[in-house]
């Protein structure tokens, strides 16, 4: 039974996901349905965590919008995500960057890795 579930999940995994880690700034293209129309909405922020594996894998991106911190959690393999772009790679020493919630302004910056 477990093998069948794993095979079904494997068929639903997206193949075009770029390799990004916490600390990277990502731009997520999300499909939004408004009435009869479907449009693409961008969310650009720092990836502060990745958790889970397989079909249940998620990541959380954080940005500051008009002085207010906004965090949004996305399932990695959802069909609602059109694509994920990596804007810049950040150098961090933690897997979960929850400490950024307490930082304001320049203290919340992350050092960039040149690749």
From Swiss-Prot:
Keyword vocabulary terms for this entry: Ribonucleoprotein, Ribosomal protein
Name this polypeptide is given: Large ribosomal subunit protein bL19
GO biological process: translation
GO CC annotations on file: cytosolic large ribosomal subunit
Family: Belongs to the bacterial ribosomal protein bL19 family.
PROSITE patterns the UniProt entry points to: RIBOSOMAL_L19
Function: This protein is located at the 30S-50S ribosomal subunit interface and may play a role in the structure and function of the aminoacyl-tRNA binding site.
Protein's UniProt keywords contain Ribonucleoprotein: yes
GO molecular function: structural constituent of ribosome
Keyword Ribonucleoprotein in annotation: yes
Pfam families: Ribosomal_L19
Name of the encoding gene: rplS
InterPro entries found in the cross-reference section: Ribosomal_bL19 (IPR001857), Ribosomal_bL19_CS (IPR018257), Ribosomal_bL19_sf (IPR038657), Translation_prot_SH3-like_sf (IPR008991)
């Amino acid at each position: 039974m477990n093998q069948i579930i794993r095979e079904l999940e494997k068929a639903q995994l997206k193949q075009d996901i770029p390799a990004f880690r916490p600390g990277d700034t990502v731009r997520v293209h999300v499909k939004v349905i408004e009435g009869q129309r479907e449009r693409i909405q961008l969310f650009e922020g720092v990836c502060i965590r990745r958790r889970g594996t397989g079909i249940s894998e998620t990541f959380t991106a954080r940005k500051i919008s008009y002085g207010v911190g906004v965090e949004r959690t996305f399932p990695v393999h959802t069909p609602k995500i059109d694509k994920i772009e990596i804007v810049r790679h950040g150098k961090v020493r933690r897997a979960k960057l929850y400490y950024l919630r307490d930082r304001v302004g320049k203290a919340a910056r992350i050092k960039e890795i040149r690749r």
